[in-house]
């Protein structure tokens, strides 16, 4: 008899149903994971809204790419994991043979498979993944924290590209989970001053608690006052046209502007090349998590980065569709599904 499991299946725009589906069969070099927690990402929201995420999704599909759990079955070719291992998963499966992979640019892999986008992911009781995608989680680390490894890994790639040096002044626009992680990574990177721009008071307080020196409401500080701080780096984490444009305006001379927040695919910003020219600005973007998953897990396990204070109480799988549909609910913090 086929074993069944509960999963949230995406059928298209605004259509997610919790159903009984077959437990996936494990291939030779795969492991079967009993999912413990799976985070709700902005990419999941884009997909739910019918936008393009970081990969094409062809329904029906089980979404969810930020997850942790326990290995319950091994494929015949797996020798480096055991049943009972606690793991988190890098959802981006590389071919390891295309020109991008062979030149250490695997996030541009020509044959990448995305777990939770292109193939079934973690919004289910069980998921089968290639063993090479798993990272062992130590016994002291809660699996709900380990589920946050993937978003932290993405942030690490972004912060690496910012080239922050000791004593730099950094602005972070937006203090959702990603912004709060960026505050902590900027501090670890040596920033001497970190300012956060965020309209929600509770999020500003969280930013201060996690290492920001000052946190401003955009309604309470002028752009001229922000410009006077001569930021060496501005990290935009809201993914809005107006905040991307603001990031360029408040950046100091020779600053790096990291456009980290994910906009909708058809969004366009209005920038004046002359403004970039006279300040010699460097504009950068950051795409997923190339080779940063292991580093991210170490930061979580060591406690150097707090990934839990911004997480809301875990929700049930049956509540996922409501969270995906409600921007107001998501504004309260990071949501994680407990399986």
Give residue spans per PLM region.
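Glycine-rich cofactor phosphate-binding loops and adjacent beta1-alpha1 units
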Residues: 162, 205-280
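Glycine-rich beta-strand-centered segment in the early N-terminal region that forms part
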Residues: 22-38, 52-99, 138-141
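Short glycine-centered segments of the SAM/dcSAM-binding site in methyltransferase folds
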Residues: 86, 169, 255-256, 282
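N-terminal glycine-rich cofactor-binding segment
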Residues: 9-25, 42-73, 88, 106-120
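Mid-domain Rossmann-like dinucleotide-binding core that forms the NAD(H)/NADP(H) cofactor-binding site
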Residues: 141-220
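C-terminal hydrophobic helical "lid"/dimerization subdomain
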Residues: 2-3, 245-249, 290-339
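Conserved beta-strand positions in the Rossmann-like core of class I SAM-dependent methyltransferases
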Residues: 194-195, 258, 284
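NAD(P)H dinucleotide-binding glycine-rich loop of Rossmann-like/cofactor-binding domains
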Residues: 95-173
């Amino acid at each position: 008899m086929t074993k069944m499991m509960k999963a949230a299946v995406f059928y298209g725009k605004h259509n997610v149903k919790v159903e009984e589906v077959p437990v996936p069969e494990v291939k030779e070099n795969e492991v079967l994971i009993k999912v413990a927690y799976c985070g709700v990402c902005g990419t999941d929201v884009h997909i739910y809204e019918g936008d393009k995420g970081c990969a094409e999704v062809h329904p029906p599909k089980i979404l969810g790419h930020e997850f942790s759990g326990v290995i319950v079955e091994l494929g015949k070719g797996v020798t480096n994991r055991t049943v009972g291992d606690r793991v988190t998963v890098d959802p981006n499966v590389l071919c390891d043979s295309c020109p991008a992979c062979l030149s250490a640019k695997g996030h541009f892999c020509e044959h990448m498979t995305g777990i939770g986008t292109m193939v079934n992911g973690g919004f289910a009781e069980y998921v089968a993944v290639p063993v090479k995608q798993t990272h062992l989680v130590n016994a002291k680390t809660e699996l709900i924290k380990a589920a946050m490894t993937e978003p932290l890994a993405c942030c690490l790639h972004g912060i690496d590209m910012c080239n922050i040096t000791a004593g730099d002044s950094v602005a972070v626009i937006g203090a959702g989970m990603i912004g709060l992680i960026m505050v902590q990574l900027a501090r670890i990177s040596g920033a001497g001053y970190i300012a956060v721009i965020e309209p929600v008071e509770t999020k500003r307080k969280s930013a201060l608690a996690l290492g920001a020196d000052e946190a401003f409401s955009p309604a309470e500080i002028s752009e001229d006052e922000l410009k006077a701080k001569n930021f060496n780096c501005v990290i935009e984490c809201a993914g809005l046209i107006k905040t991307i444009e603001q990031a360029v305006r408040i950046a100091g001379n020779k600053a790096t502007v990291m456009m980290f927040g994910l906009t909708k695919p058809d969004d366009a910003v209005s920038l004046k090349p002359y403004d970039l020219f006279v300040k010699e600005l460097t504009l950068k973007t950051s795409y997923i998590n190339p080779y940063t998953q292991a580093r991210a897990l170490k930061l979580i396990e060591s406690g150097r980065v707090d990934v839990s204070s911004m997480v809301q109480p875990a929700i049930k799988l049956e509540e996922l569709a409501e969270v995906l549909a409600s921007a107001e609910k998501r504004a309260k913090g990071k949501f994680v599904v407990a399986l």
